[in-house]
Amino acid sequence: MNKPRGYLCSTTDDRGRKCVTDLLEGVSARVYPVGRLDLVSEGILLLTDDGELKNRLTHPRHTIGKIYRVKVDGKVSDEQMEILTSELVIDGYKILPVSLSVSSEDESGTVLKMTLFEGRNRQIRKMCEAANLTVKRLSRISIGNLKLDGLPVGKWRYLEQHEVDYLYKATKEKNEHV
């Protein structure tokens, strides 16, 4: 799914807010979001009815990279880049260092490309806050080698079998044969 801003990564909400499953017209299976993007974030989101795959993709021991495009206010200094790529403690947890590059920079701000290998709650926003950066827009653009590839915002598609196989292989245990 290409999750739009303004939707919760949940199946229901007791406060009546829109949920990503509201966008799944014609899907009869009970599916659940894999991981999360906060209410004001957008981008690629996997939903599944496969509990084993969901557990593999969300368990911390499986480090499948997720790439984000992060638009921040202003120019990003070398010092701020160093903070973002250092070992930070967020909410009492040491987080894995991220891969980071500047995609573009202009008068409206800087676009960063960040690769994360774990997904703590609001991790990118908290990392940027630690570096004194204000996030203007946050989009997840890939999960491993899965990309949106032109999928319109608010739309979804079924994964191809080779994509499901890739996710299982990318998250397999060392002693497990797929």
Label the predicted regions.
Residues 1-178:
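Basic, flexible Lys/Arg- and Gly-enriched helix-loop patches that mediate nucleic-acid binding at interfaces
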